[in-house]
Amino acid sequence: MKKYLLEAAQLARGFMPHEEGMSLYEIALQVAPRSAILEVGSYCGKSTIYLGAAARETGSTVFTIDHHRGSEEMQRGWAHHDSELVDRDSGLMDSLPELRRNLEKTSLNDVVVPIIGDSLVVARHWAGDISMLFIDGGHGPVPAHSDYESWASKVTRGGFM
């Protein structure tokens, strides 16, 4: 992984330990050439940078889906709430500007396509196969299972979930 991307990933807001990010990167390098990578839940883009680095090296694309309003534990009054990510006009959590800044800083805009919305809605309309699925959206059992049920059948044979 290029040094500037590694440094950007380590500095990006997020909760993924570096070792897990490197595992994502290594797996993506192996499966990405087959078809696209899909990430459910990008937050500010920490894991997206690891995946995007692999996509850059393999000529693949990362599609990352997030509504950018935060999962339950990121809301006001919860342990992982970050008041710096609250939109001043709406008063709602909004991690999209931070994701965009991270994609600009890393020049990964040409290999990462953010999709703003609910993953279940996007899944109903998704027509292509994916070689790698990384589910890190809603962390409760119901949202995580719903994401799995909606996306698992779209992973190609020999792909990774």
Where are these regions (language model features)?
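S-adenosylmethionine/decaboxylated-SAM
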Residues: K2-M161
